[in-house]
Amino acid sequence: MESRKIKIGSRGSPLALWQANWIKDQLESRNPDIPVEIVIIKTSGDKIQDVPLAKIGGKGLFVKELEEALLRKDVDFAVHSMKDMPIKFPFALCIASVTKRENPFDALISRDNIKLNDLPKGAKVGTGSLRRISQLLHYRPDLKLIPLRGNLETRIKKLETEGLDAIILAAAGLIRMGWENKISEIISPEILLPAMGQGAVGIETRKHDVDNQILLADMDDEILSLIHISEPTRPY
């Protein structure tokens, strides 16, 4: 009989691989007799970097190829940032575990550590999110919002290379990468309401693979799972 092996599907960005390796470590510590492998899968959202997400299908583009790999049984689990997940899933798949949440709010990184309220009139602020753009323009209609794509490192570099005054990113990713010192300000949810599931990592699998779901049972934050179910109903 062939020994059991778990394959985790992940995007290839440093943050995605940090999350996948964290899940791998959790699985291996709980199941030392089961080897775990990470399989890197490039998604449409990773391939298309020069067009705003809203124009090419939205944040679901970061999960499509991962879900296809699950359906083909190329991988057993797919690890996602929950903020990238669409509300609807393929019928044969499910989120089997939502892990403990990191800081769910958005963070400002600015030149000279300037806070949002202190940015000069007409300041150029980079972000790739329609959610952030609409809320920021409501709060500071004088700001000039610049489309921003790429992984965390790329977007942080663009603060310098594209002459931006500030950029806005999810705080959770910066914290996980050990870059808290780059954060100028955690933005209040009264100004910028975060995305559904922001800060949480979700593990997707096939509905009928009960044995695999059992492996994840004690990694699930039950309260957070209930919060995630309720968040799609929030007005934005």
Specify the residue positions occupied by each region the protein language model found.
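Single conserved hydrophobic/aromatic residue that forms the stacking wall/gate
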Residues: 227-236
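N-terminal hydrophobic or amphipathic helices and topogenic motifs
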Residues: 1-81, 93, 227-228
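Phosphate- and divalent-cation-binding pockets in alpha/beta enzyme and binding domains
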Residues: 19, 87-88, 135, 155-158, ...
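Beta->alpha turn/N-cap motifs
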Residues: 42, 81-85, 169-174
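Short beta-strand-to-loop elements that line the ligand-binding cleft
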Residues: 37-40, 143-151
